[in-house]
Every structure is written in structure tokens, then in C-alpha cells.
């Protein structure tokens, strides 16, 4: 099954010409200038985000929110459900869902926006709540999408304009859950300076798929993979930065 994974667009709608069966969007989608404005966020989602992504050459899109997506934390579930009704987009908040691919394989997918606390942002909860949410993931999960990364999982924030040193800033509670549960694939966002390559984390193939760099410039390409139920994969785009051949 060919998939496209991306995250952290912060209102910058990417042009994606490639086609795939499924797309995963791992949060931080709403423009920074309106992130705390509910009416503006709703209008942008309805008039900009949904038409743009609904026109993509994919059959299904799974979306989670990020720590800048305050709308999704405050909106009633009925509002969100109505917003995406009749579109390709399925919104997940600590939920499991099954997807039947074109080859007849069933994929179990889990999505969570939860992040560990480091300021006054959306979806940041104490460790006991995060553990409860992450443990909702089924034991036989195939694909996990989260905004945060687990501690030690592609989570080194490089020294830049925001951080004074290289350090791990991943989620300890997520790491604890992933010691017991091993999804085949895990796609994350949140860290604009993280390594964007696919790496192995305790048997799980994982990648940070944010598109913006630390200065909020569109720098990285969406990740495109051909994935197998066995956990094997083939990288379709060999270069992950803009301006290089896919």
C-alpha cells in the first residue's frame, strides 16, 4: 500500500502531485496567526484546508491535531464530525480505526494528538492522562500517528534559534507504552529540526514528517512509502528536502 505522510504545515498548503492510497497528517495544520481564534480556524478549515486536501490524489486521509491546533481541542465532537462529513478526511483523537486496502488487507490505525507538557499549548496533559490515552492503541496496531514523538525516538532537537543544545525532548509516557506495544509504523510531527529519515525504534519503523523547518519555511517533502503488512517498506522519494528530485 502506498502512503503519504506529512505534518506541521501551519497553514501553508503543500502542492503534492504524487498519488497514494492513504495519506496521514500528523497535526499542526492551522495557521499560526489564527491558531487561538475559533471562528477564523473553522472558516480556514472549511474554505481552505478541506478543499485543498480533498482534491489530493489519495483515497483516504487520516488526520490528527497538534499542539497549535486549539480549534480541535475546544470544538464539540459534533462540530468536527460535521466539518469532515462527506470528505476523504477522517479525524482521530485517541481512536483506533480499521482500513481495508485495495489488496484486501486490513490495517489497524491509531491516532493521538497528546503531547507532554512544555508550555501552555493544546493537547498537553499530565502523564496519567497521556498513559491512559496511548494505551487505547490496540495491541495489533499496524500504523500509529501522533503529533509528539516518544522519548528516544527521532526526538533530538538540534541546536537552533529555539533550543540551546542538542537534547531529547520526546514523550516518556509514549515511550513506556511502546515498550509493550509495537506498531509496525509510527509517523510523528512536532519537531521541525528532527531527523526526517525512517529509522527503527524497538522494531517500529518511524519517521518525523514535519514539512516546515525551525523558521517555519516549507523545507521538507512529504514522506512517500510503499508499506507491507509484514512491516517491510520501500522508500518512494529518496530525497526528503525541497529542491531535490523525488
In which residue ranges do the predicted regions lie?
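Active-site environment of divalent metal-dependent phosphoester hydrolases
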Residues: 10-15, 30-34, 64-75, 96-101, ...
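Core catalytic region of metal-dependent phosphoesterases/phosphodiesterases
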Residues: 6-102
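Active-site-proximal segments of metal-dependent phosphoesterases and phosphodiesterases across multiple
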Residues: 30, 34-45, 140-182
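Beta-strand-turn-beta hairpins that frame and shape the catalytic cleft
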Residues: 1-4, 96-111, 139, 143, ...
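Short, conserved loop/helix-junction motifs that constitute active-site signature segments
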Residues: 17-18, 52-58, 82-86, 137-138, ...
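Active-site neighborhood of phospho(di)ester-bond hydrolases with catalytic His/Asp-centered motifs
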Residues: 5-7, 23-28, 60-67, 91-94, ...
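Binuclear metal-dependent phosphoesterase catalytic core
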Residues: 97-103, 176-181, 185, 192-246
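Binuclear metal-dependent hydrolase catalytic cores centered on His/Asp/Glu-rich metal-binding motifs
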Residues: 105-143, 163-172
Amino acid at each position: 500500500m502506498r502512503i503519504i505522510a506529512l505534518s506541521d504545515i501551519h497553514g501553508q498548503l503543500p502542492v503534492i502531485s504524487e498519488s497514494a492510497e492513504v495519506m496521514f497528517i500528523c497535526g499542526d495544520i492551522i495557521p499560526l496567526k489564527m491558531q487561538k481564534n475559533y471562528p477564523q480556524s473553522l472558516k480556514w478549515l472549511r474554505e481552505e484546508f478541506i478543499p485543498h486536501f480533498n482534491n489530493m490524489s489519495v483515497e483516504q486521509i487520516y488526520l490528527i491535531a497538534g499542539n497549535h491546533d486549539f480549534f480541535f481541542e475546544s470544538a464539540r465532537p459534533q462540530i468536527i464530525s460535521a466539518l469532515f462529513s462527506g470528505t476523504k478526511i477522517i479525524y482521530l483523537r485517541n481512536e483506533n480505526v480499521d482500513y481495508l486496502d485495495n489488496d484486501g488487507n486490513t490495517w489497524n490505525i491509531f491516532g493521538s494528538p497528546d503531547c507532554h507538557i512544555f508550555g501552555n499549548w493544546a493537547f498537553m496533559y499530565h502523564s496519567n492522562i497521556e498513559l491512559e490515552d496511548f494505551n487505547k492503541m490496540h495491541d495489533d496496531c499496524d500504523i500509529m500517528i501522533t503529533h509528539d514523538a516518544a522519548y528516544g525516538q527521532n526526538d533530538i532537537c538540534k541546536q537552533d534559534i529555539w533550543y540551546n543544545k542538542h537534547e531529547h525532548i520526546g514523550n516518556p509516557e509514549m515511550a513506556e507504552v511502546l515498550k509493550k506495544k509495537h506498531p509496525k509504523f509510527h509517523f510523528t510531527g512536532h519537531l521541525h529540526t528532527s531527523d526526517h529519515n525512517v529509522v527503527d525504534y524497538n522494531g517500529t519503523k518511524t519517521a518525523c514528517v514535519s514539512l516546515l523547518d525551525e523558521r517555519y519555511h516549507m523545507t521538507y517533502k512529504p514522506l512517500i512509502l510503499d508499506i507491507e503488512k509484514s512491516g517491510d517498506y520501500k522508500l518512494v522519494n529518496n530525497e526528503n528536502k525541497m529542491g531535490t528530485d523525488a
